[in-house]
Amino acid sequence: MINLIEIRRQLHQIPEIGLEEHKTQKYLLTIIHQIIQNKSFIQVETWQTGLLVYLKGSQGQKTIGWRTDIDGLPVEELTNLPFASKNGRMHACGHDIHMTVALGLLEKLSESQPKNNLLFLFQPAEENEAGGKLMYDGGAFKNWLPDEFYGLHVRPDLKVGDIATNEQTLFAGTCEVELTFVGTGGHAAFPHTANDALVAAAYFVTQVQTIVSRNVDPLDSAVVTFGKMEAGTTNNIIAERAFLHGTIRSLTQEVNELTQKRLTELAKGVAQSFDMTIDLKLKQGGYLPVENNPKLAKELMDFFRNETKANLIDIAPAMTGEDFGYLLSKIPGVMFWLGINSEAPLHSQKMQADEGVLDFAVEAIGQFLDIKANRN
C-alpha cells in the first residue's frame, strides 16, 4: 500500500512549471509502476510531460475519466515546512494534493479489474498553457477518450470533509489581455511635440471599466482587471510605449466574447482618438468556463450528500479560472472543490494543506468512482 503522506511530501519538494514537469513525471511513473505491476489490464502512455493510465474494463461499455493537474507556480515558498520546496517554485495551488489523491484512487480502483474502463489523466501545464486543450487537440487520448470526466480542486477556506460543487458553472472562463499603446516619445517640457502613450493607456484603463457596468447584463457576471502597467523610463521623458497586462473573467462564454469584443473596440477607439497605434493580444485558449453537466453533477452531489464523512455544499460559482473547462466543453463531467483547511489562500507563499484530506479524499471519492466503474 502506498504512503500518501510521503508521496505528497516528495511531490511538494519538486514543483515545476507547465511543460517542464520532467522530475514530476519521473516520480509519478515510479509510483504508478509500483501500483500496476502484474496487472495486465492496465496501460500507461506518456504525452510530453503528462501521463495517461488506462484500466481496461472487463465489459468496457464506457470509459470514466479522472483528471489531475501536475504543475507548480513560480512562487518562492515561505511555509517553513521541513519538506518545503527550495527552487523558486511552489505547489501553491495544491496540485501536489491533487496528484497524491489521484495516485491513491488509482491504487484503490486497480485492486481488481473494473467492469467499465477507467482513465487517469495526469495533465501538465494547467497554470500557464492550458495543458488540457493541448492534450485534447494533440490527440493524446487516442481511443481512451472518456465518456464522463471528473476532477477536483483544493480549496483552503473549506474544511477537510467538505466537498463543494453545483449543477451549473463552477469556475469562470478567463482571457488574458496584453495591450501596447505606441505613440511618440519626447521631452516632458514639450508635450505638444510628442504623443504620450502613458496618458492614452491610463485613459483606456478607466474607460474599459464601463464594459461591465454598461454592456454586460447586470444579472450576468464579468470582471475586467488590469494588474500591470509598464511605461516610460524617467520623470522628464514622455513615454513612447505603454504596456497593459490584464484579465477578463466571466461565467459564460457568451459574456466573455462580448467583453473581448467591446474591449477591442474601446482599445481601437482610444488609439484613434490619441492618434496612436496599438498591439492587442487576447489569449483565452483553453480557459473556458467550467460548466458541470447537470445530470452528472446531481448524481455526484446526491452521493456525497448521503456520505456520513462528507459535508456536501451546494456552492456558488467562483471567478477563478481552470483549464478543465475546455475538456468539459468536449466531454460531460463534473468538477468540485475539496476542502483542505488552510489559513493562507491559493497561490499564497504560505499556503499549507491539512494532510488529513488525503485519506478522506481517496476513501470518499474512491467509493463514488468504484460505483461508476462497476455499474452495468
Curated annotation (Swiss-Prot):
Enzymatic class: hydrolase
Catalytic activity: N-acetyl-(2S,6S)-2,6-diaminopimelate + H2O = (2S,6S)-2,6-diaminopimelate + acetate
Known pathway: Amino-acid biosynthesis; L-lysine biosynthesis via DAP pathway; LL-2,6-diaminopimelate from (S)-tetrahydrodipicolinate (acetylase route): step 3/3
Active-site residues, Swiss-Prot/TrEMBL: 69, 127
Signal peptide (UniProt feature, chain positions): none
InterPro entries linked: AcetylDAP_deacetylase, Amidohydrolase, Bact_exopeptidase_dim_dom, Peptidase_M20, Peptidase_M20_dimer
Keyword Thylakoid attached: no
Superkingdom, taxonomy of origin: Bacteria
UniProt-listed Enzyme Commission number(s): 3.5.1.47
GO molecular function: N-acetyldiaminopimelate deacetylase activity
Coiled-coil region: none
GO biological process: diaminopimelate biosynthetic process; lysine biosynthetic process via diaminopimelate
Keywords linked to the UniProt accession: Amino-acid biosynthesis, Diaminopimelate biosynthesis, Hydrolase, Lysine biosynthesis
Family according to the record: Belongs to the peptidase M20A family. N-acetyldiaminopimelate deacetylase subfamily.
PANTHER family given in the database record: N-ACETYLDIAMINOPIMELATE DEACETYLASE (PTHR11014:SF98), PEPTIDASE M20 FAMILY MEMBER (PTHR11014)
NCBIfam families to which the protein is assigned, alphabetical: amidohydrolases
Name assigned to this protein: N-acetyldiaminopimelate deacetylase
